[in-house]
């Protein structure tokens, strides 16, 4: 959902530009304050804060050891997306109370993420606790597949190392060489892909399905009464 939201905005830019749409700024690749502000708020309030909260509440409880590490891996993934968009952002003190939250340097954020992901990958206990219903890497029993989480953490670390190679080649090379010594702990096939597993009810299904299918079906009676066939195709909008 996090990346999908930004991709939707970028694709909207392209489609509006290609179609010659008028009105607003999006087809001119302009910045829209409302879109940018809402995305920033959603990043912190609805994407990062929940997984950060898991860590602060459960980090000292050994029964939640793996689940805290999984939350930390996902938090670092979300921050990796945010820093790639905005550069320096609040991270180390992002969730401290107060109105004046300092921004971390972009380079410091990358170094912290690289260290965090290594600690998480190394710290996962393959025979330890799991989420009973894992929405990202479910096993056959729907609980967390810990090996896939380990591979994801290592692969994300590899991606971040490649991303900083022009800024700090020495650090990037160090991380890449280390990871390539154990390629079996990296994502190696489509089976390892990081995909959100959607459900089949209103609480768990893809929101685009609701938008494009459910909303359309709920408007069918109104479309028939309007007598305009073109509205059938415009229903989701």
What are these regions (language model features)?
Residues 18-74, 78-237:
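Structured, solvent-exposed acidic/aromatic patches
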Residues 1-24, 56:
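Extreme N-terminal leader/anchor segments
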């Amino acid at each position: 959902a996090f990346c999908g939201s930004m991709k939707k905005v970028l694709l909207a830019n392209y489609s509006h530009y290609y179609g010659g749409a008028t009105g607003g700024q999006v087809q001119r690749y302009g910045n829209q304050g409302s879109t940018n502000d809402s995305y920033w708020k959603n990043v912190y309030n609805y994407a990062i804060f929940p997984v950060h909260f898991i860590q602060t509440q459960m980090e000292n409880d050994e029964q939640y050891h793996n689940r805290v590490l999984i939350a930390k891996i996902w938090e670092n993934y979300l921050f990796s997306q945010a820093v790639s968009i905005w550069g320096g952002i609040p991270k180390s003190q992002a969730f401290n109370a107060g109105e004046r939250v300092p921004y971390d340097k972009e380079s410091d954020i990358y170094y912290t993420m690289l260290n965090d992901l290594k600690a998480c990958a190394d710290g996962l206990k393959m025979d330890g606790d799991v989420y009973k219903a894992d929405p990202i890497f479910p096993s056959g029993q729907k609980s967390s597949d810990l090996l896939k989480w380990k591979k994801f953490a290592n692969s994300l670390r590899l991606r971040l190392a490649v991303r900083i190679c022009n800024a700090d080649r020495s650090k990037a090379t160090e991380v890449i060489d280390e990871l390539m010594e154990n390629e079996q702990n990296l994502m190696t096939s489509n089976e390892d892909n990081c995909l959100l597993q959607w459900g089949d009810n209103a609480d768990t299904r893809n929101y685009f399905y609701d938008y494009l299918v459910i909303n359309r079906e709920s408007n069918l009676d109104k479309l028939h009464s309007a007598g305009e066939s073109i509205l059938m195709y415009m229903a989701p909008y």
